[in-house]
Structure formats: C-alpha cells, structure tokens
C-alpha cells in the first residue's frame, strides 16, 4: 500500500512557501512518473531553483536506494541543479552494452547519485523522516521534498507538474523564457483533463496491466485494450498533422513546431504521454510483451510526434536515459521474479530512438 501526499507550494501556504534551493525532487531516472516531473522542471527552467536527487536504477525488495556520499560531497552540489541531477549517461542517444553491469554497481553519477540533503541510503528513510509512523508498505517516486521542514510536499507526479507550472518559482528564474511555456493553459485545461482521463489508465498504466498480467486471458484482454488506445492517440495526432499540413501548405518545419497532442501547444498532455512512448519500443515491446506493433513501425504519426519532441526539444532529449530505462525495468526485483529471471538486458532495438 502506498500513501499519497497532496500538498502544494504557494506564497499564501502556511508552511510550504516558494524559496530557491529549498525543495528537491527525489526520483528514479528510469521511472516514467519521475520523468514527467523532471520534464516539467526542465521546461519551466527550474533547474537552478529545484534540486534533483536520482536513485540507483535498481529497485530491489527494499525499494529505491542511493549511492554512498563521496569524500567532500559539497563539491558536487551544483550537479543536483542540472537537468538530470548530474547523471552522465543521460547525454547518450543510444544505450550501451549492459551485460557486465551488476546490480551492485555503484558508479557515482552513472548508476545514480548520493543524497546531498538528508544523507539517506534508501527512499523509505525519506518517508519515515516525514512520518515516523508511516502506514504504507510502498515508497513511491517522485517525491517533492521540503528540506527546510523535512516534510514531503507531494508524491503525485501530476500534482507536481501543476505545482511547477503554477508560476510560484518564476521570481527566482533569470531566463526570459520562463513565461513562454504554460504547460496547463487556462483555455486548454478542460481538454487536458479529458485527455488525462483516458491516457493515464489506458496507456500510462495500460503497459503495466499487460506486463504484469498473471494469466493468458487477462494478458490478451489488456494488450488489445492498450493497442486500441494507442490507435486512438494515433488518430488524434494524424488529425492534428493533417490540419497543420493544410494550414502551413506542407511546410514540415512549421508543422513540427506546432505538432503536439492538444491545441498546437506543448502542454501537460505531451509530458504525460512522452515517458510511456519513449519507453515503448525499448522496453515494453519485449519486456512487457506489448508486441502487437512497435511505435516506429506501427504508428507513424505517434512516432513522428515522439522523435520530434526528442530531437527538437533538449528538455526531452537530455532527460531521457536509455541505460537507466532498460536497467530500471529489466533488473527490478519484481521483473526478476516474474518476467526475466536472469535479468538479461536486450541489446535492441537499434536505434533506441530513430532520427527525425
């Protein structure tokens, strides 16, 4: 059982007020729900304001863990205020050969980071710092942590996106771009919420319903439901593309500049969908047996949307770590027990992401 924390940050809040360097996101780079929060942080130019602490890629029976702190940990402080919390492999566009990487590998800022805030070794410790009588048995990411009060503000990725988008940290941002991207524009909020209501259960969670199915009948039902909804999204994006094609007389550059899920603007709808789709061919097709089609070969408009975000928006490209994505799923203890006993990480597909 997991417990949700639903706090927010605002100038009028009695406890959680905006402050530079006070709050941190704890998460796992391979986790799609953490990825949402990291994307929002980067797109809102909040890296200098909001720290990011990323765990080791393996989730074992005790949950997420962090690496031991190095000698003179203070000299690494700036790394936690970068797009990927200092993890080096996020700059690679291709996963490496991972067969000789053991689960106890502890390469600093490669396999994960240490915790510079509370110096904990397990994410569970953060939950118990927040509440010594924490009633849950699961310790989920992402976590938005207040280092001043040593309390969890929020651990729901969707809420964290909206907190970061609210403008509460804008006064601390130097970049003129901070007000350009509104991830939840007022005129699209109803459409965004409507989109979330089917994308979240049918696609974001749908891949897990397929991959963790415990009998063939359930698997077949869930995999068909998943692909029906991928096709639904394909139709949405096809319609968007055709409309843009007419508007811009086939000018590909202008089309791609407006090619998003909703309203010709980059919104929360794109942020919620991207982490699932970027992981699809790389992990879900083979590991979760979501194998009726691949994105690259079976959904041309969805695939174009994906590679457009990856190659044309640095925030998407440099928060996507194919090494961590593969290791996170393949070496997860529940995967070893139920899906891939020997934890063998597939080399393919190649490339991990097609060129635009």
Swiss-Prot record:
Family: Belongs to the GST superfamily. Omega family.
The gene coding this protein: GTO1
GO molecular function: glutathione dehydrogenase (ascorbate) activity; glutathione transferase activity
Coiled coil: 214-257
Reaction(s) the record says it catalyses: RX + glutathione = an S-substituted glutathione + a halide anion + H(+); L-dehydroascorbate + 2 glutathione = glutathione disulfide + L-ascorbate
Entry protein name: Glutathione S-transferase omega-like 1
Cellular component, GO annotation: cytoplasm; peroxisome
Cysteine disulfide links: none
Catalytic site positions: 31 (nucleophile)
InterPro entries: Glutathione-S-Trfase_C_sf, Glutathione_S-Trfase_N, GST_Omega-like_C, GST_Omega/GSH, Thioredoxin-like_sf
Disrupted-gene phenotype: Null mutants display increased sensitivity to cadmium in the absence of GTT1 and GTT2. Null mutants also show growth defects on oleic acid-based medium, indicative of abnormal peroxisomal functions and altered expression of genes related to sulfur amino acid metabolism, and have low levels of reduced glutathione.
Keywords, ordered alphabetically: Coiled coil, Oxidoreductase, Peroxisome, Transferase
Keyword Oxidoreductase carried by entry: yes
